[in-house]
Structure formats: structure tokens, C-alpha cells
Regions:
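Central regulatory/effector-binding core of bacterial HTH transcription factors
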Residues: 1-37
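Conserved amphipathic alpha-helical interaction elements at protein-protein interfaces in regulatory
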Residues: 2-6, 132, 172, 176
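C-terminal regulatory
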Residues: 34-146, 176-177
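A late-sequence structural motif
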Residues: 139-178
């Protein structure tokens, strides 16, 4: 905002795929493999999921040593992934024991921090909790599912300056904070 004080932001935080044209949305951030060919997109980051739990959960339930052991643990899943109870690793998919599911990444992290089970999220979303030991990464040696994150915007011949400026800000931010 300091770079462009004239900009006004109206931010909606949800994980639903809103129709940009129908709702007159300038930019959406999508963590997905894109399917809508009617939108333009700027790739911001490629993020890998990591798997984690609280120290208390692991002390009580043990730490899984491989992906197949996830089926015997309580797992907190993201309900907007389909199917939500299948976690993808580089070379395999594992059906997990889904005890809680939510469409809120924030809620998933909070539940994991409270000891409710094992969860999966992009590493950048939980790195601070690894640093302060509120969460412990499990299976770090396994190659987790990787997902691109894009800034998507309406397909038109002219991109307004405010959209270009915001996309540049996002791109610079994620380049600096990988």
C-alpha cells in the first residue's frame, strides 16, 4: 500500500472458486492446476505440501515412519480437495483416516496445533510453527504433492494498471519469501 496509496482493496478470503466476471473480481489467488482457459494467470509460486502434527499428538500416538502408516493415525483434511481423504506423495497416493475435515486452512492448522491429528498444508503456511516447536514436520524425506499458486484475472486485451501493479507486488513478495 505504501507504493500505491491510491489503491483501494476489497479482500474476500475464502477457498471457493468465484466467477471473476460475474462478481466483478479483479484478481483471485488460486492454488490449483488451472482449468479455466478464459482467464489469464501469473504463476506466483510452486509450493509443496508438508505433513505435521503437534508434539503432544506425536507423543501420545507415535510418529509415522512412512506414508502407509498415515491410515492408522487421526488426520485433519482439507474438504475442498477431492477426495479429501487421499493424500498424494510424489510416487503414491495414500488413503488417510479422516477424523476432521474443514474448508478453512486456518482451522486445519489450529486443530493440528491443538493435538487433534496430523494435517497437510503448504510449508510456508506453517513454517513459523515449526520454528517455535508448536508443530513437528513428519515424513520430511518424502516428496510431497506440489501445487502451483497463481494470480488469475480476466482475459482482456488491456490489463488495468492497478491489476498489473498488484500482480507485480504479489510476484515480488513470493519471490522474496520462498
Amino acid at each position: 500500500m505504501a507504493l500505491h496509496p491510491e489503491l483501494e482493496l476489497d479482500i474476500s478470503v475464502n477457498d471457493q472458486h468465484a466467477d471473476l466476471v460475474k462478481y466483478n473480481i479483479d484478481i483471485a489467488i488460486r492454488a490449483a492446476h488451472l482449468e479455466d482457459l478464459n482467464l489469464k494467470a501469473k504463476k506466483l509460486i510452486e509450493h509443496s505440501l508438508c505433513y505435521f502434527a503437534s508434539p503432544d499428538y506425536l507423543a501420545e500416538n507415535g510418529t509415522p515412519q512412512n506414508q502407509s502408516q498415515l491410515s492408522t493415525h487421526k488426520c485433519i483434511t482439507y474438504s475442498l480437495m477431492h477426495p479429501s481423504n487421499v493424500w498424494t506423495f510424489e510416487a503414491s497416493k495414500v488413503q488417510v483416516n479422516e477424523v476432521i475435515k474443514s474448508d478453512s486452512p486456518d482451522m486445519i492448522v489450529k486443530m493440528a496445533r491443538s493435538g487433534a491429528g496430523i494435517a497437510a498444508m503448504p510449508k510456508w503456511m506453517v513454517a513459523e510453527y515449526f520454528e517455535n516447536c508448536e508443530l513437528v514436520e513428519i515424513l520430511p524425506q518424502k516428496h510431497a504433492f506440489s501445487l502451483p499458486m497463481y494470480a488469475v484475472y480476466k482475459n482482456s486485451n488491456h490489463i488495468p494498471d492497478k491489476i498489473s501493479a498488484f500482480i507485480k507486488f504479489l510476484s515480488d513478495y513470493f519471490t522474496k519469501n520462498k
